C-alpha cells in the first residue's frame, strides 16, 4: 500500500466524517448558545474492520476505528448542546462487497429474508435518529441481518502498578502475566474465542 492509498482512504472516511460533524456541531452549538432548544442526532458509520480488525484492510480499518473513537469523544463534547452521537458498524452485501460473498445456491432458491440485505441496517439508523434514542450516546452498534449488539470498545484489563518507573527488564515478567489474564482479542466478527 502506498502513502497515497493510505491517505485517500483516511481522507474519505475519517476526514469526511469529521467535516460533516464539524459543520453540524457548529450549527447546533450556535443554536444552543442562542437559547434555542436542541435535540439533535449524529449517526456515523464505522465498520467491524475498524473495531475488530480485518487482514488486508489496515487503511480502511484504521479510518473506521478512528470513526468509532471520534464518535465516543464527540458524544462527550456535544452532549451539553443537546446532541447525541452514535455509530453503526454494519455488515451487509452491497455493490462493493458482493464479489466477496455470493449466495451459494446448491440448487436452492435464495432465502425470502436475506440477512445480508443492506435494508436490514436502516431500522437501527432510523431509531438512532429518532427522539426515542435521546438517552443513548457515545455508542457503536454492530448490525448484521437481525442482529444488533453494542460494541464494548477498549476497556482497561489486568494491571500492575509498581508505584515507580518500570525498568525494561522488569516488564519481561509482568507483561506476559497481564496478557495471560486479559480477555483474548476478538475475531473479525467481534466474538471472543473460547478456550
Region spans (language model):
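C-terminal helical subdomain
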Residues: 87, 108-195
